[in-house]
Amino acid sequence: MRRGSCLCGAVTFAVAGEMRPVVACHCTQCRKATGNYVAATSAPRDAIAIDGSVTWFQSSPKARRGFCPTCGSNLFWDGPGANLSIMAGVLDQPTGLSME
């Protein structure tokens, strides 16, 4: 079980089971949303339990980004498919994950 949270702790989450290796995305949307590239992993939606209120921004016709409404931490990227992407930096350490 891996856990993570936003900066202020208002949103926490737990991930049961395997997570994908961390990937770096340099697309325009990721850079504009964070001011840098994004390092993210993902897991099946049904393996992620979120506690707290996440604000979702529809960043494209096919994807939305989840962040904490209090501190603004980028937490999730929700696009097509069975997995929800999780920003690697919000996971509690150590993760045991490696970058692909």
Language model segments and positions:
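A short Gly-Trp-Pro
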Residues: 1-100
